[in-house]
Swiss-Prot record:
It comes from the Eukaryota. Component of the velvet transcription factor complex that controls sexual/asexual developmental ratio in response to light, promoting sexual development in the darkness while stimulating asexual sporulation under illumination. The velvet complex acts as a global regulator for secondary metabolite gene expression. Controls the expression of the T-toxin gene cluster. Promotes oxidative stress tolerance and acts as a virulence factors during infection. Negatively regulate mycelial pigmentation and controls sexual development, as well as asexual development during vegetative growth. A motif (Nuclear localization signal) lies at residues 35-40. Component of the heterotrimeric velvet complex composed of LAE1, VEL1 and VEL2; VEL1 acting as a bridging protein between LAE1 and VEL2. It is found in: Nucleus; Cytoplasm. The gene is VEL1. It comes from Cochliobolus heterostrophus (strain C5 / ATCC 48332 / race O) (Southern corn leaf blight fungus). Residues 1-16, 413-429, 440-449, 482-505, 512-534 have a biased composition (Polar residues). Belongs to the velvet family. VeA subfamily. This is Developmental and secondary metabolism regulator VEL1. One of its GO terms (biological process) is sporulation resulting in formation of a cellular spore. Pfam families: Velvet.
């Protein structure tokens, strides 16, 4: 949109004839144009945070009589009034104008008197150091010259030949307009530049002009660090993104789509700006089960004990493929073995899965491998639920694998063999709760349980790769010592499981502090009372007749009633008082001179 062209921009002149026939010419010129301003608004704080137009406009006046300059000799008073005009055409209003309170757009001091200065050239100057604009836009200033005559000969021909006392009237003589300047909003305001040489020159001659000796411009170009103020101008698009449609779109149809609708600034529409979500328990469980499935796909080590069982190695990858798919609860669903597999191979798959579950380190956030196994598998014996400790799990695994190994295989030394027999015998009367356990129990009825050390060897890397987590104190149970020497049929009474699976009763040994080598703890606290160490008579007894606490009891080193001259100290004995109130004496050894 182009600016409105005016004829009297920057320069203007007017000529008039006096009563005696002389021609007076007035030449007005804007020698310092306004360039920028910051909109101060019309709120309550507009007057407090108001920025003047920069640089301050300066208008020069010269008065001529018949081509002879008489600026300093002309006897008259001049003042210049500034008004604000739009530099561009204003579109007609879209809404009917309401008669409401309207504030003047131009604020400050719009009137300036003439100052006779010698520099830059001898002339009269009008300076406007305090002009502000309320609203942003493109404006220009219009300066109107008014004259107050002091002599009758300078009056106009139609004026009466009288000069009123007190100068009651002025006459409009000339008008000049400034160049268009821009009023910015507070966020887009580029700042103030250093005061011009003309402003300094005027200020040196006594005029009140604000002088800035440093540049207060916002460095928006060639600046590496993008701050919030420059983010809008340097292509960051913060204001551009959250800005709504411009007023030009108000005239469109209600249902017409906006072509350049700004994108929402919400972090939900941009995944990169959204805060990261913490992984849930199920997601961590899937990743943990997938890593274990990868460990099971490794070929088992070649040991001479299981060299005669090729069916175990052939069914192991098949079992891993069944459990690699992510499921919410892999422990709750039994594997679906093929119908052509032998019972021994099916049982070996289940035993390897259960033995690997024993060797895995506890992960509290995982529901399959954490401490919640007591609710998920209430029918398992304590030896399977106990490997919640980092270093106690391998001996348990070795014991279980050695106790249930085939008699013809090589077996490692174990603590006792009775728990294995009791477990086998007591596994029949226990009622299963899970399909997984029911599947395992049906296999145990037909054949004895065979646990292979290969499953422990394959799960050992996962036990070392994952860091052990600190066990929860509330769910921590003491390891059960293998003291089950009762007949095989009494195992079901020692380890009882409720029908609802909510409460479990384990035969745990009672904690004895004497066997652990811990010092006995008394029921009461060992903290000494105040009166056993310090004199508390002044606290418990009455203080009458100006009495004060007397620290002259036994054990105190100072006695106010004793004479100033004390007895010589016995160097053979050293007496002191302990914190518990007891008096102690120690022999001081003689040091040879």
């Amino acid at each position: 949109m182009s600016n409105i062209v005016v004829s009297n921009e920057t320069k203007s002149q007017s000529v008039r004839t006096t009563k005696d026939g002389r021609q007076i010419r007035y030449n007005l010129q804007v020698i310092q144009q306004p360039e920028r301003a910051r909109a101060c608004g019309s709120g309550a704080k507009s007057s407090a945070d108001r920025r003047p137009v920069d640089p301050p406009p300066i208008v020069e006046l010269r008065v001529f009589e018949n081509d002879q300059e008489i600026t300093f000799a002309y006897n008259a008073n001049f003042f210049l009034h500034a008004s604000l005009e739009n530099a561009r055409t204003i579109a007609p209003g879209r809404a009917p104008s309401t008669a409401g309170p309207s504030f003047p757009v131009l604020t400050g001091t719009p009137v300036a008197g003439m100052a006779y200065l010698d520099r830059p050239t001898p002339a009269g100057y009008f300076i406007f150091p305090d002009l502000s604009v309320r609203h942003e836009g493109k404006y220009r200033l219009s300066f109107a010259l008014f004259e107050n005559l002091a002599e009758v000969k300078d009056l106009d021909p139609e004026d009466p030949d009288v000069i009123y006392d007190g100068n009651h009237f002025v006459t409009h003589r000339c008008e000049v307009k400034s160049a268009p300047f821009t009023v910015f909003s507070a966020k887009k305001f580029p700042g103030l530049s250093e005061s011009t040489a003309l402003s300094r020159m005027v200020a040196e001659q006594g005029c009140r002009v604000r002088i800035r000796r440093d540049v207060r411009m916002r460095r928006r170009e060639n600046k590496s660090s993008k701050e919030w103020d420059e983010y809008d101008e340097e292509g960051g698009g913060y204001d551009r993104a959250r800005g709504t449609a411009t007023p030009d779109n108000y005239g469109q149809a209600p249902n017409a789509p906006l072509g350049d609708r700004p994108r929402s600034l919400s972090s939900a529409s941009n995944p990169a700006l959204a805060p990261p979500r913490r992984p849930s328990i199920e997601e961590m469980g899937h990743g943990y089960s997938a890593s274990n499935g990868y460990q099971q796909q490794m070929p088992p080590p070649q040991t001479p004990a299981y060299a005669q069982m090729p069916s175990y190695g052939s069914n192991q990858p098949q079992y891993s493929q069944q459990y690699q798919t992510p499921q919410p609860a892999p422990m709750m669903q039994p594997p679906q073995p093929p119908q052509h597999s032998t019972p021994y191979s099916q049982h070996s798959q289940h035993s390897s899965y259960s033995s690997q579950h024993q060797a895995q380190p506890p992960v509290p956030m995982n529901q399959q491998y954490g401490y919640s196994n007591y609710q998920q598998q209430p029918q398992q014996p304590q030896s399977q639920s106990q490997p919640q400790y980092d270093h106690a799990a391998p001996p348990r695994q070795e014991q279980m694998s050695s106790d249930y190994a085939h008699p013809s295989d090589y077996r490692r030394s174990s603590i006792t063999q009775s728990p294995a027999q009791q477990y086998t015998a007591s596994s029949h009367p226990v009622q299963p709760y899970h399909p997984m356990d029911q599947y395992g129990r049906s296999q145990q009825m037909s054949q004895p349980l065979h646990s292979s050390p290969q499953s422990y060897a394959s799960s050992a890397p996962s036990h070392q790769s994952l860091p052990s987590l600190r066990p929860i104190v509330a769910d921590k149970l003491e390891p059960v010592s293998p003291s089950y020497q009762s007949p095989p049929t009494s195992m079901s009474a020692a380890i009882s499981v409720n029908s609802d699976g909510s409460n479990q009763h384990y035969a745990l040994p009672k904690f004895n502090p004497q066997t652990q080598g811990l010092p006995p703890m008394s029921a009461t606290s060992n903290k000494r009372s105040f009166s056993s160490t310090f004199d508390s008579r002044h606290l418990n007894e009455r203080m009458v007749a100006g009495s004060r606490p007397q620290p002259s009891g036994a054990g105190y080193s100072y006695d106010p009633g004793s004479p100033d001259m004390e007895e010589p100290m016995d160097r053979a004995a050293m007496s002191y008082r302990r914190a518990d109130g007891t008096q102690r004496q120690r022999h001081v050894p003689e040091v040879g001179s």
